[in-house]
UniProtKB/Swiss-Prot annotation:
Its main location: nucleus. Coiled coil: none annotated. The chain crosses the membrane at residues 3-30, 57-78, 97-113, 133-161, 189-207, 214-231. Keywords: Membrane, Nucleus, Transmembrane, Transmembrane helix. Residues 31-56, 114-132, 208-213 are perinuclear space. GO terms for cellular component: nuclear envelope; nuclear inner membrane; nuclear membrane. Residues 1-2, 79-96, 162-188, 232-253 are nuclear. It is a multi-pass membrane protein. It is found in: Nucleus inner membrane. PANTHER family: NURIM. This is Nurim homolog.
Amino acid sequence: MTSIAKSIVLLASLATFAYSLYVVGSLMMFLSTPRSISKAHTWIFNLLDNKSRLQTAYGPVVFDTLYLIGFIFQHSFLKSAVVKKLLAKLGLSGAERTIYSLTSSLCLHYLIVNWLPAQSIVLWQIDVEQSAPLWWTFVITHGICWVVIFGGSLVMDLPELLGVKQAYYDLKAYGPPISYKSGELRNLYAHVRHPSFVGLSVILFATNVMSVDRLVMALLLTTYMYLAWSTDQKDVAYQKIQLQRKKLELKAK
């Protein structure tokens, strides 16, 4: 690409960075806002006594599942070797991560905006608004999980995670940012590129109203994360070594 084209890619990556943060903020509100209690519900164990509730949940669950499958497909397909080779042939290697981040954010934003609740069937529901201890427990639990996720994103180099650093390095004719990292860290990033499987899983399942649509989302996304994040013993050993080094550094101070 010419320097002008690379500059445009860099500007696009900065815009994508800002948009991605906005979408993540929307996701926080979507997943972590306490849900209101509906009196018109059927416990999931009593479906045989009230089949009409099951029928009204069909439509939302089908559409929500399609939204999730679309997001998962995009998230996996754009990481494939086929897409990477195509972008390389088009001279867009420096924009690869930006394109990935932008399309991921668009799919996630579409899912959030168009999500259809199916609260006629619930697995459990807790009215946290009527109890200050329960409300604070819910808020603090989700808050800690989000702090862990954002902290992990910063540790994993957020500008690189969202594609800004790749576009900048390409403009400056540097090598890819990942090439400046150790082999062990590159191996870890190849296996997991988002922080905190546990944090995301807790956020998905620790809801005060576990309706059938939320259950479908929690099950599909945690299953996808479990299958996609394939860390091995080398990754675990590397992280243990880094943790020990950090402890020694803190003691030295």
